[in-house]
Amino acid sequence: MEDNEFDELIDDWFIESLKTYRDLYVYQLEFPTRVIEWTSGKTICVTGYNKSSKNEILELSLPQKLFAEEKKGLCAERDFKVLHGGFSPDPVGVLKHIPGTRLIVTNDELTSDLQVWNLGGDDSDIITKVSSVQGSAGSPGGVKMAARISPQPEVLHGSRGGDVRLTQLTTGQTLYQLASTCEERLTSLHFVSNAVFLAACANGDILTVDTRTSSPPQLAPAPSTPDSDMWWTDVSGRGGLIRVSSSGWAAVSDPRSPASIARQARLAAGAPHREPHHVNVLWAPALDDIVAVSGFSGAVQIYDTSSWQSEPRDSHPLFEHRGHAVCSQRGEGGAVAVNCLLWHPKETRTLVSAAVDASLHVWDWIHRSDAR
């Protein structure tokens, strides 16, 4: 693409963004990140993924202007700010913040071992490693994790359906070991209560596990759809489970009965990126029936699932964030993949997204009905 054409494309998109975003902040990291994780309502953690060098772990504060209720024009802080930082000798492909603490847990996606880090506090700006957790013997890399508020910090982790365990981080003690022969790779883990969690498999199966019993997990098979080689899953605190397949099929269930499909659709998402870890499917925590999907193109798509029915029909996005795709046109003549995505836990329509070109965007989108 010629420079003049690229400049016109950027100008057109920014003019359009004045009508479609309440807020939009564009930031360039020094390194691409595969993870974004909230450490508070105004701070995120990002990390590098370079197999041949040390990788930064950074805690960033979001622009204060984003959270200014009134007179945003008078708010001086309009940029991201590094609060704490450290280095990992290994790439970081998975990261989980432990709620109620200053601890994060990381995995390099090469082994199943975990590294535990302290993010620091007011008296120190250094992120330091405090301990390690050895993974299951023979377990592959690419650990998935889930965390919950508990008296002692703990994390649920595993790579396959048969090697999931709950570990207390202060002692390294295994609090629970899943009794299952399932060898399917996991795409995510989700607590649905203090005692029950769901293990989502790459083939679309869902394992429901009650940690209070030694009974084997309940298996809910994948939806029956054509050409769906891989599935990604999310569970909403508002009571919905969604599975999206590599062919663009989406199915919504009640987490208490994941085998029963309540409604489904065919998404206008296109083909997924060649790297499965780039795909993200996330319910909006502060909105009913709204889900964000990324990794199928250079855009983040927002869908309203409330209109979906028991029989699948084509569904078109309510909103698309094309900022990463537009801004990447100069580099390689094509869009880059969005490889991580996060909704704000309380701000209704605010998301953070990052792409493989190291771009980091924070954006608050406007619903079409609000723009009239």
Go through each PLM region and give its residues.
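Beta-propeller domains
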Residues: 1-27, 37, 41-85, 107-134, ...
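Amphipathic alpha-helical protein-protein interaction segments
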Residues: 22-29, 50, 81-88, 157, ...
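Canonical WD40 repeat/beta-propeller blade segments in eukaryotic WD-repeat proteins
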Residues: 31-38, 90-97, 136-149, 181-192, ...
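Structural hallmark of WD40 beta-propellers
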Residues: 42-46, 101-106, 150-157, 194-199, ...
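Per-blade loop-tip surfaces of WD-repeat and WD-like beta-propellers in eukaryotic adaptors/scaffolds
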Residues: 63-74, 113-131, 152, 159-186, ...
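Elongated alpha-helical scaffolds
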Residues: 89-109
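Loop/turn-rich, solvent-exposed surfaces of beta-rich toroidal or solenoidal domains
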Residues: 274-312
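Blade-level signature of beta-propeller repeat domains, shared across WD40, Kelch, NHL, RCC1
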Residues: 338-372
